[in-house]
Amino acid sequence: MSESKTPKDVIKIVKERNVSFIQFWFTDVLGILKSFSITPSELEEALSEGMGFDGSSVEGFARIEESDMIAKPDPATFQFLPWRPKDRPVARMFCDILEPDGTPYVGDPRYVFKRILAKVAEQGYTYYLGPELEYFYFENNETPKIIDKGGYFDAPPLDTAGHLRRDTIFALQEMGIQVEYSHHEVAPSQHEIDLRYDEGLRMADTALTMRITVKEIARQNGVYATFMPKPLFGENGSGMHTHQSLFKGDANAFYDASDQYHLSAMAKSYIAGIMAHAREMALVTNQWVNSYKRLVPGYEAPVYVAWARRNRSTMVRVPMYKPGKEKATRIEFRSPDPACNPYLAFAVMLAAGMKGVEENYQLPEPIEEDIYEMDEIARERAGITSLPGSLYEALQEMEKSELMRETLGDHIFNKLIANKKIEWDRYRTHVSEFEISNYLPIL
């Protein structure tokens, strides 16, 4: 990542580069990006005091009678937007949302993540993340019409969108975001860009930045990019496999050279925590009705709560690309999808893992056989449970979770559940094309 900037640095750069507008970015509870722009004349005051706005119109924020909010920009996140004109550049900063008295707003997803990160930092740990965001390119946002027929790792002529990935990576690099690699994914018109691991809060900001960058570069090229988890029937959906580790100083707290899996006792309890709380945090990591169309057997998406080293049918995997190398030791949580709110999703992952560490959860034996090939009896014998099969089931699990309420705080916990109940009711009562085509001719 690029070097962090102070308010003084930002003011100087804006003046020297003749910046025309500075966008202030934050998200609602669902992770939908919100933005407003200020002119350079307002910048100094905005950096010191923040900018007021009406929070009652933002999903999951305040009620109308308590709507005054302050967006306080984080100068460390200042970057130019590469898709804007170079002669009158536009920059952006992520914001923390504050109450009028300057205290953090409990409904701010970024604050939720910062709070759990601070708790972990007090114990001497730094949380690192490396998400793999998959997505699709379509001709437009009205119908999922593919633009290529490539498959996994295909090159041209089957992969005809390499230029889109390339231009996206160039834009990300201009913003100081490091990319490890990119490639065509399994489904037609599906792609992946893997971000180089980074500290937790920066990575949450980066994940949101990447989503916007992918969409902007696609728009400039006359196509549409979507992070919808399952836009095509009969094809793989898009996941956000999230690699994560905890470091204490320069030492990887997940690494133990003497262990047969090269995992420390802490790492094992962390994995056990992720597994124990996977069902109750699914509403956050997989928050849409459509998310559960991806989490079905047969499409390489994890359905079952288990862990392994090389087995990709499990929910948690310990990558073995560089076995025995301390810095590379990490876990990969495979069930989240890229349409989540990164702040909340990363927060609940960390909270679940640390709950396992704090209470010394015991990790079961790894499952190294293909779980999809096991029958129900075999899975029961192995102690393998499954993730929720629908948004409704995920709602039921989260509603009774003390850990999720504690991690998210009462405000976001209640707002998210209320929003998702409405979504489920709308879906449940909707008469779909499936019903019309299958039932109308015969009933």
What are these regions (language model features)?
Residues 2-443:
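Glycine-rich, acidic/polar active-site loops that bind/position phosphate-bearing ligands
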